[in-house]
Swiss-Prot record:
One of the essential components for the initiation of protein synthesis. Stabilizes the binding of IF-2 and IF-3 on the 30S subunit to which N-formylmethionyl-tRNA(fMet) subsequently binds. Helps modulate mRNA selection, yielding the 30S pre-initiation complex (PIC). Upon addition of the 50S ribosomal subunit IF-1, IF-2 and IF-3 are released leaving the mature 70S translation initiation complex. This is Translation initiation factor IF-1, chloroplastic. Component of the 30S ribosomal translation pre-initiation complex which assembles on the 30S ribosome in the order IF-2 and IF-3, IF-1 and N-formylmethionyl-tRNA(fMet); mRNA recruitment can occur at any time during PIC assembly. One of its GO terms (cellular component) is cytosol. The gene is infA. It is found in: Plastid, Chloroplast. HAMAP family: IF_1 (MF_00075). InterPro entries: NA-bd_OB-fold, RNA-binding_domain_S1_IF1, S1_domain, TIF_IF1. Keywords: Chloroplast, Initiation factor, Plastid, Protein biosynthesis, RNA-binding, rRNA-binding. One of its GO terms (molecular function) is ribosome binding. It comes from the Eukaryota. It comes from Buxus microphylla. Belongs to the IF-1 family. PANTHER family: TRANSLATION INITIATION FACTOR IF-1, CHLOROPLASTIC.
Amino acid sequence: MKEQKWIHEGLITESLPNGMFRVRLDNEDLILGYVSGKIRRSFIRILPGDRVKIEVSRYDSSRGRIIYRLRNKDSND
């Protein structure tokens, strides 16, 4: 049986080495996020200030996997 994960939205606050990021969730928690393989293969750039969807395990809520970069409402791309 596959493990259930929580999906949150948050804001990238800091970029760390090796594809790791500090993410502030909408509920004000600060967790460590790493880039999923699909985002890494697609060469999607994630920068501080971006909004992302992050998948958090029920067993370790201090780390999560970034699964989607949300589009900014004010950008024109």
